[in-house]
Amino acid sequence: MKTTSISLRTIAAAGVLALTTLLTSCAGGDEAEGASASNAKTTVRFALDWTPNTNHTGLYVALNKGYFEEAGIDVEILPFNNSNPEVLVDAGQAEFGISFQDTASMSMASGADLKSVLAVEQTWATEVAVLADRDDIESPADLDGLTFGGFDNPAETKTMQGVVQSAGGEGDFETVTLGTSAYEALYSGDVDFTVPYVAWEGIEAEHRGVDLKTFAYTDYGFPDAYQVLVVGNNTWLEDNPDTARGFVQALARGYEDSVEDPEAAAKILQEENVGLLTDLDMLVESQQMLADDYMLDDNGDFGIQTEQHWSELGQFLFDSELLTDNNGKPLDEQPEWSEFFTNEYLQD
């Protein structure tokens, strides 16, 4: 699936970026002065973590419905090209991007200039998966001595060890790094378990007639996490609070629409990515699953983050020595988790 597709809207945004840069070249970092001088929309760059999928639906819904335009913003989507969105945002090459709580925590602990501004999914959306006919595997505790098909995520092996240990096992298994080939390796029996995204690869497996048995991390006492986040460049956020608020609120509206009408949102996602996403039934099923089970918190709200949620997974990452400084040395004490996220841009 590592194909890169640039929609017509993305190409158009690139042209707008060039024009906006020309018009506002004398405006500097003062967004109010720039707007009054040129009346041009502000360009905001958003980095994707993968080819477009239902994790990104709210972005495309907001584009399609003109929510960003209402906020005076032109969005330039930076397609996935093997560059980590966190790296692009930290370097100022994108204002916002998709991220994940574990990797975002590790990046910010080491000094990355990031802040999480919105939680797309409130809970883990990946689960441990084995073939359904593996009668010898009834819980993650049974994975000791087996082979894990991994993805080269810096936290994944210790996370799997933590899940196995939480279930009563030792966490002693072999990891082979396969990337997206891990799914085929599981289906063919070349690895014993992997971690599909249940609202995507889980549905794909079902459509292919592959029966899986899955185990949710939190069912065994492992801490929960925000599976998908939107992070912003912290310096840019502080320098451009009005644009940041306009962008985040427009984006949140798109995701909220995706919860309220998953089928319509899935159709928009497909329309905005012509030729790339061809299976509408799968898109609708995936979007419905996310809307029902993952995108809203216990109060029925979208996007909100809490310090407790950050600190619970953070404690595991700290104890596992996955949080290091910019020299790679494990931190001596936990970070101030409240500094890693903000809800302020969701509020008027």
Give, region by region, the residue ranges found by the protein language model:
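Bacterial signal peptide processing site
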Residues: 27-30
